[in-house]
Amino acid sequence: TELDAAEKLRVLHDFYRQGEEAAFLFDPQDMMRKGHDFKDYICPDSMEKSSDCLKLGEKYCRVLFLKDYASYIKDSMVTELTDFNRNMMLSIDVVPIPTDEAVREVENRLLGIETNITNWQRRQNANNNFSAVVPYDMELQRKESKEFLDDLTTRDQRMMLAVITMVITADDKKQLDSDTETLLAVARKHMCQLAVLKFQQFDGLNTVLPIGTRRIILNGTATTESLAVFM
């Protein structure tokens, strides 16, 4: 559902000023008459930052991002993360890649893998080891790259660059650390890796909030089908 300006500001107000939700009032005419800025009503009274968390007013918050994910993810993972009984936000930023550019990228990646395998086999042959089996990690890289290329060329999938971020809040640092470990454990259960943004908490917060900015580098490659799990 599309939000108007007042509803968007209410979302930000309720995040920045938890416990003061009922006090939200947006009257632009009255603000202009008094010479007030709407930001004064939205922003917290103070902001403090450290390497791995922020303090907004009296609340602590921490921004996490999905650092790595499994080749297959159940759609229940996002549900488990967001069902956690805490004030939080989850954001998914996606940039589609043109199909011709995506195919070229995957073909180059596959060519690099095949070259590595060929060089490895040559080294084994030079040592008279003619029956050596290609290492599992190389074989897996080749298999996944071929499947990715097949998705793009025959299954009409699109290649996407994505970053998934989430912010959680707590009353104190101890609770924040405990909640963070709980969320990291949920991700590990699904063979994914959530991580804390180090020295990028403000950039992460500006990325996860619904204000249309992205300050974090896109670090994940996915197809439309695999990305749909997070929607």
What is the predicted function of each stretch?
Residues T1-F230:
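Extended, folded cores of ATP/NTP-driven motor/assembly subunits in large transport
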